[in-house]
Amino acid sequence: MTILRKTHPLMKMVNHAFIDLPTPANISGWWNFGSLLGLCLIIQIASGLFLAMHYTPDTLTAFSSVTHICRDVNYGWLIRYMHANGASLFFICLYLHIGRGIYYGSYSYTETWNIGIILLFLTMATAFMGYVLPWGQMSFWGATVITNLLSAIPYIGTDLVEWIWGGFSVDKATLNRFFAFHFILPFIIAATAMVHLLFLHETGSNNPLGIPSDCDKIPFHPYYTTKDFLGMILLLAFFFTIVLFFPDLLGDPDNYSPANPLNTPPHIKPEWYFLFAYAILRSIPNKLGGVIALIMSILVLALLPHIQTSKQRSLMFRPISQFLFWLLVADVLALTWIGGQPVEPPFIIIGQIASLLYFTIILILMPIAGIIENKMLKW
């Protein structure tokens, strides 16, 4: 008798991706974050769907519809806070996933890595548009400031901004189209994640040693399904601790005030997961230069496969590169802190130094460290 999971056209796809998939025997907990990101996406789509049933994308009623969800809908407060904090959880997992990819040299799988960068851009776009929807003060002013950055594009900038706004300022048309895009993008993310997996399974997973593991593979199920399940339980425990005990820990108090175009908040800043990029944007006095630096802060990841000089893939046995990696992590945390501070001394110069260090580590110091380590090993 043939096994159904190996013959049925649909089951066969699932089998090859999650059951009989040959997986390196030595991958660590850092490889859990792919499946955890899948869980985050499911949480976001499910909670978002229920929120969309009660939300109205209109400048007059958007804020009160969110209040209505929290007060009058059964467990509406829970769904709303799950969705808001789910975004933070998504980005925590995303940044850890990218960090693991850099540390263990997973960027050598160029197609998988590039699709991952596209996924990061899509997720950032979705999160930004979602932040606008409650129509609080920070929603409105965040949307105004960030969309206005496009006006830095020479010649067509102003027309482009007004086209995106659907008028001469952020208004009803903007809110409506942002809601439409915010609804459709997670499904595009899900489809792109499938392509990400497709490319990954063409090459197989990397491992902590960064060496080929074809001679030592084990089936994904039961070894890694149980490991992923444990990761999911721990993640959900952390998630619900935040949602149920500290739901507003990661949000901005200004967003509890309805949007008012006549009253600018003292400090306009995005959600915490964009602060590092926002700090890089602000560290350059020129508008167009700042926008280019902002985009490059993410796009620089696409250069990693092309500027690797070391003959070892992983950083596991490369102490100089390890030091630079953790310096980069500290630098990103410093940028995140600076992004939330007002634009005044000493924060301006700290932000500029941290921004310069960010690009210097990735583009100059890491490749030089790779060459030095090759020489030390007489390679």
Curated annotation (Swiss-Prot):
Domain of life per record: Eukaryota
Cofactor(s) demanded: heme b
Protein name: Cytochrome b
Sequence similarity: Belongs to the cytochrome b family.
Binding sites annotated in the UniProt record for heme b b566: 97, 196
Binding partners and assembly: The cytochrome bc1 complex contains 11 subunits: 3 respiratory subunits (MT-CYB, CYC1 and UQCRFS1), 2 core proteins (UQCRC1 and UQCRC2) and 6 low-molecular weight proteins (UQCRH/QCR6, UQCRB/QCR7, UQCRQ/QCR8, UQCR10/QCR9, UQCR11/QCR10 and a cleavage product of UQCRFS1). This cytochrome bc1 complex then forms a dimer.
CDD domains: cytochrome_b_C (cd00290), Cytochrome_b_N (cd00284)
Cystine connections: none
BP terms from Gene Ontology: mitochondrial electron transport, ubiquinol to cytochrome c
Localization per record: Mitochondrion inner membrane
Organism the protein comes from: Dipodomys elephantinus
Function: Component of the ubiquinol-cytochrome c reductase complex (complex III or cytochrome b-c1 complex) that is part of the mitochondrial respiratory chain. The b-c1 complex mediates electron transfer from ubiquinol to cytochrome c. Contributes to the generation of a proton gradient across the mitochondrial membrane that is then used for ATP synthesis.
UniProt GO cellular component terms: mitochondrial inner membrane; respiratory chain complex III
